[in-house]
Regions:
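Immediate post-signal peptide segment of exported/extracytoplasmic ligand-binding proteins
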Residues: 34-45, 64, 168-172
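Extracytoplasmic ligand-binding site segments that recognize negatively charged/polar headgroups
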Residues: 45-57, 72-82, 94-226
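Short beta-strand->loop
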Residues: 115-122, 136-138, 242-257, 266-268, ...
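A bilobed periplasmic-binding-protein/Venus flytrap-type ligand-binding module shared by bacterial periplasmic
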Residues: 146-153, 189-191, 259-274, 290-291
Length: 341
């Protein structure tokens, strides 16, 4: 091979510098390499069930890193989003590239073959239980159901430390429950063990809890004193009220229902490479810091929540796949136990 001329050496060095520069972009060698190629694909379509403000914050942060990418998002409820995705699939015209939803609907999308496996290099920073073993989804943040209570009506000495404490006579008629809290119900039963869990739910129903629709509403009713406490609202529901001066606080009763929020790639994504790049961002430390800034609890192990000890000691309860396989049966069991018609 003939020796390289100075011009050829300079060209080689410039190529090397360019490659190194690409690799160093926000510390992400795989996602950053080839980003220019991916940016030429066009629009990225993101379907989300998070609220509009949170979804916009995430997509805006991504666009600041990749200004050539036009990200369009559509936000709706879990059930409406599922119907939309299924209708598109039946018509053979899927529009979306990436979806962010909750655990049960992520499971359904995978089961119906609508997701593509994508083992993002960022997934190594997520614990088992927070990512699909076959790489079809990874959870970006988790909402934990805790027991929130009114600090004016519940003295410190009476704050429950276990689920069983709520079976005491003093709590009869004083607890609010989400009227469609099916995943809380199934995950708690899974966490306790089926026999013990179902027995507990029947005993809890005998305490005459008040059923309401909406976790935010339940937290507000606790703050107003309509209930002394509620089992099914999330940490952020109570922290928002507490920070606004409401007389509420919360405690985690093990096991605590962990509501995952998986992000996944469409099996027939119009722009699969852009979709992968967006997922890489959402799972990256930078993306997870955006999640944290929205007062959510990131699932990435090196991105602690704010404050860092927020979920210290919480024992998460996930809904087992075999439970999802029989989810309709558990819905009927919930309705039977709590008298929902």
């Amino acid at each position: 091979m003939p020796p390289k001329t100075p011009d050829r050496r300079n060209a080689a060095m410039q190529s090397l510098r360019a490659l190194v520069g690409v690799v160093l972009i926000w510390g992400h060698p795989v996602a950053s390499f080839g980003a220019e190629v991916r940016e030429t694909e066009g629009n990225l379509i993101f379907y989300s069930t998070s609220n509009t403000a949170d979804t916009k914050a995430v997509t805006d942060s991504f666009k600041r890193l990749y200004p050539k990418v036009d990200v369009q998002f559509e936000r709706t409820t879990d059930s409406q989003l599922m119907e939309k995705i299924l209708n598109e699939a039946r018509a053979g015209k899927p529009r979306w590239d990436v979806v962010s939803t909750t655990g049960y609907y992520g499971y359904l999308l995978k089961k119906r073959g609508l997701l593509a496996a994508y083992d993002s290099p960022e997934r190594k920073h997520f614990r088992a239980g927070f990512k699909d073993p076959q790489a079809f989804w990874t959870s970006t943040y988790t909402t934990y159901a805790v027991f929130g209570y009114n600090t004016k009506t519940v003295p410190t000495s009476a704050v429950p430390r276990s689920h069983e404490d709520l079976l005491k006579p003093a709590w009869k008629g004083q607890v609010g429950i989400e009227g469609r809290g099916y995943e809380w119900f199934t995950a708690t039963i899974s966490g306790m063990g089926r026999e013990k869990g179902v027995s507990y739910m029947r005993a809890l129903a005998a305490q005459n809890p008040g059923l309401r629709i909406g976790r935010t509403l339940l937290a507000q009713l606790v703050a107003a004193g309509e209930f002394n406490g509620t089992l099914t609202a999330y940490i952020h529901n109570f922290d928002a009220l507490k920070n606004a001066g409401a007389p509420v606080d919360w405690v985690a009763l093990p096991p605590s229902f962990a509501n995952l929020h998986p992000v996944a790639l469409n099996a027939k994504a119009p722009h699969p490479n852009l979709g992968k790049l967006f997922i890489d961002f959402m799972l990256s430390q930078k993306g997870q810091e955006v999640v944290r800034s929205l007062k959510r609890i990131p699932d990435r192990i090196d991105t602690p929540p704010d404050p860092p000890n927020l979920i210290q000691g919480i024992i998460p309860a996930f809904t087992a796949p075999e439970v999802y396989d029989n989810f309709e049966r558990y819905i009927k069991l919930f309705q039977e136990i709590f008298g929902v018609h």
